[in-house]
Amino acid sequence: PFRPRCPLAYDRCVTEEPALEHVGVEHSAACHRSAELVDVGIELYEPTWVDTADFADAQAPEPAVLAAAHNGAATARPAGEPADGRVMQVTNLVKHFPIRGGGLIRHQVGEAHAVCGVSFDLHRHETLGLVGESGCGKSTTARTVLQLLKATSGSVRFEDQELTTQSRKDLRPLRQQIQVVFQDPYASLDPRMPVGDIVAEPLRIHDRWSRDKGPKEVSELFRMVGLNPEHRNRYPHEFSGGQRQRVGIARALALKPEVLVMDEPVSALDVSIQAGIVNLLEELQDRLGLSYLLIAHDLSVIRHICDRVAVMYLGKIVEIGTRNDVYDRPTHPYTQALLSAVPVPDPVVERQRQRILLTGDVPSADNPPSGCRFRTRCWKAQEICEQQDPELTERGQGHPVACHFPEVTAVLQTR
């Protein structure tokens, strides 16, 4: 039954359904090629033949070829490779929300400290991932960078232009260069509009639509994201979740932006569909030279697609570095706790490894702890952690970390 979507299908798969057979200790699979593939390690989300092949003419590669491709240059750009240049710079970004009391006048009685002094750079053709627990300020950071929320203080520069001081009129041409892909493909598309009109809407808003070229551009955008242009007159409810997200990506690409801000673009999709969207994003980045600011809580997605990773806790970045730095050499206790919750695809190692269980609840952003914000849940906390907020700086561990007692601990160990 999986044959129509399988990259390794061959003639026998058409005529005979495979039986569920043992391929290892406590491991069974219903596949005619299980014996060939049992020793080929394929990571989740790795690009496969199915992503690039022409199904009409191509033949499936032999498992040995597939293994060689996997063990070779599977990703287009190694983690930590210098990018082409800085396209966006965020410095000491702060966003506080007023808390108002009850009554008729509703005086302000406090502030919610959603984002507090966040700084990072985004380079051309780079993917920067923001990770952290729900409520840590990831989405608020993205909305403030996009100027959908007015920053309390701080700077957001895009190609040497300061965005926080621009008027709505001046921001209009700049918004064409920074587009957004939303989390929920069911809520981000107007159910009353055909998907072709949804994709064309940015072109019409920014006066870039022409009767002659417009339909061709929309058709090309559909092909670019793997959709059939003949379906552009259908409505969103006629598409699956993955197809709707592809429509959202096509809409974001309509104005030929340089930066895509993506707020958990695959979290609402099934795992099998997530892989296709992630591979599509990588292909588009390589083809168009895009820069991504990716917000996600799925650490496996972040590890696959991101060049650099920033870990947020209660409105602050506590650790930032290349993908390999953060995943292989985590330094901040909070990063180590997050990574310890990631399942390891090895039953023996998974049973032997120790989880880092955090005690207590996440403090309220209305009244954050003094000093280090993580100290109320940290097993290393000492007096200095209560008195002094650690700066995000390189402390001899190879990448910046905001901790008074940084220590590299390999959490994701495999055999």
Task: List each language-model region with its residue ranges.
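Conserved ABC ATPase signature
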Residues: Y235-F239, Q243
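Charged, flexible cofactor/metal-binding loops and thiol motifs
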Residues: P1-V87, R100-R106, T322-R415
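Conserved ABC ATPase "signature" region
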Residues: E162, K213-E230, L339-S340
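Conserved ABC transporter NBD signature motif
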Residues: G154-E162, L174
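Helix-to-loop junction immediately C-terminal to a conserved catalytic motif
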Residues: L146
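P-loop NTP-binding/switch modules centered on Walker-like glycine-rich loops
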Residues: E258-V261, P265-R351
